[in-house]
Amino acid sequence: MDLDLGVRRPYSRRGFLLGALSATTAGVLAACSQPSQPAATSAPAAQPPAAPTKPAAAASPAASPAAAASPAAAASPAASPVAKPAASPAAAAPPSPAAAAGQFSASNPPPVQNPNKSFAGATVIYYGDGVGIGNDLDKATAQRFEQDTGVKINVIPRPQSATDTFAQYQRFFQGQSADLDVLMVDVIWPGAFAPNLVDLGPKLGDATKNHYPGIVANDTVGGKLVSMPFFSDFGTLYYRKDLLQKYNISAPPKTWDELEQQATTIMNGEKGSNPNFTGFVWQGNAYEGLTCDALEWLASSGGGKIVENGKCTINNPQAVAILTKMKGWIGTIAPRGVTTYQEEDARNAFQSGGAAFMRNWPYAYALGQKDDSPVKGKFDVAALPASSGQKPVGTIGGWALAVSKYSKNQDASIEFIRYLTSPEVQTYRAVVGSFVPTIPAVASDPNVQQAQPFLANLADVERVARPSSETGENYNQVSTAFFQAVNNIENGQDPGSVLPQAQNQIQRLLG
């Protein structure tokens, strides 16, 4: 299998400090205490055509398969961190992969532990990561699994947009297609897809004891383990620390007003040598990623969490104010093309040296620190800003792995998931790709903490999540209505007119 190395997302409710981590870092790796409810089972609305403006690709990563990336949303909210860690799950401690972590490179994943060769000769079709370095790590681990077990893994990158991925999976399941064996599942999807997924409990139940119990609960529907935790996620602010120093800015912005001021100062100074330099980039396209970003804007400004207590709450003065402010960023501190950006577009703009600030997920950290990255050693990660008097927030999420009920190679597929979700592979992915682990023993590994130093900066961030619990099977339609409304505002429409209409539309969906 060829490795084309080069160049992903969002868990559910109330975060609590876990495992043997330091209290600071552990708060960032909070698990969810309540499982999310099913996301909608109807296909997502069609996406509007993208505007032409795109950032130049960053030097470091290889091109990704689709035009843009997606985070796939978060499930129910993990609230602010608690001061002391909870005990890690009661189970035999997983083997420590720390000693081997330093030997990992993208093309050198760990071997399969006690490989099961009973299914040698089988072929497993894996719809894996389509964003950032994730596809490269999928290819490398697939190659290693094939080498150790004799099972061939056909890696197919999922669409980079989570919205498009959801629709693609629906088509597979509606046709009961055998052309899908292992699939990546966003944290808000287990309930929606549960009838089409294999119960992993009989084969992988013991392995779940290694993972944060709240995340396992999110992957359990009706007493069945329908997916296995793969990695976690949350929204963060990337900033050019060298440029802050250059322009005598003492610290990254803590408020949205400060972000505007700092971005303007840096832009004015940099445009002389780089006319295309911009201040701030994010995921502005009309897709699930914009729901994550806009939820952060609202929740960090007293504007609510989209749906609360069964009611859509987006039409309020605080939401109007922050979205009016965001609208003002377009064409000033942000490029007009940001209204079409997904994860990789934003990362490419930032990593190529063309932006001062970026909202993105942890995966971008490892890519930005690669040897061929123009911004290696020049950036850091902080909490996203908030409005004055409000707390910083970050949409939290992650992905899991599942086996289709219509797969013809279910046992081989389960063995592949056992490998991908093992402590050894989670350590490899955390060290090489800055994927946030779901296993406490991995999160507390010094090698992982060294590879993800930014986590210590994020302990005080309140975790928020998309309202999948509140909206149940209507979530996908609710999110679509919300992100389309926000994208309309980005493209010039008045928040005072758009939000009442969107709130009425969402409320009708809720009944």
Residue positions per predicted region:
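N-terminal secretory signal peptides
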Residues: 1-11, 19-31, 417
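Conserved C-terminal helix/tail region of periplasmic/extracytoplasmic solute-binding proteins
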Residues: 50-110, 117-118, 245, 462-511
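Hinge/lid segment of periplasmic solute-binding proteins
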Residues: 93-118, 186-235, 260, 275-276, ...
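Long, aromatic- and glycine/proline-rich binding clefts that accommodate carbohydrate-like moieties
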Residues: 99, 106-113, 218-219, 379-383, ...
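A structural signal for short loop-to-beta-strand junctions that line the ligand-binding cleft
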Residues: 115, 170-171, 178-183, 207-244, ...
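Extracytoplasmic "Venus flytrap"/periplasmic binding protein-like
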Residues: 144-214, 218-220, 242-254, 349, ...
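Extracytoplasmic/periplasmic solute-binding protein
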Residues: 226-230, 235, 260-311, 355
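Glycine-centered hinge/linker elements that transmit conformational signals in sensory
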Residues: 262-264, 309-340, 384
